[in-house]
Amino acid sequence: MEHVAEWNVHIYLFEHDADTTLARAVMETPATKLTAEGTARRNPADRPVAEIGDELAVGRALVALGEQLLNAAAGDIAALR
């Protein structure tokens, strides 16, 4: 039997202040809900380009989410032994 599933990740962006962007990645599956956050801070010497802060914050949130998924899988594998 073929296993087919769809997991969605929702990304929420927040401008904390003029130089700080926060991102939250939320993934819900039938079995669990994982949430991870990422932050980007603009160097005052750099030009303000919102898209760059968004990309950095989201990328960091997704990396953290990936780490949580890998840890969850490792725990599930250990529980099978």
Each model region followed by its residue ranges:
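Aromatic-residue detector
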Residues: 5-9, 52-53, 75
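Short, well-ordered alpha-helical segments
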Residues: 48-67
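Acidic-enriched, low-complexity/disordered segments with a strong bias for Aspartate over Glutamate
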Residues: 17-19, 46, 54, 76
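N-terminal segment of the canonical double-stranded RNA-binding domain
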Residues: 1-30
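C-terminal structural segments of small proteins and small subunits
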Residues: 61-81
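A short, structured beta-strand/loop element
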Residues: 20-50
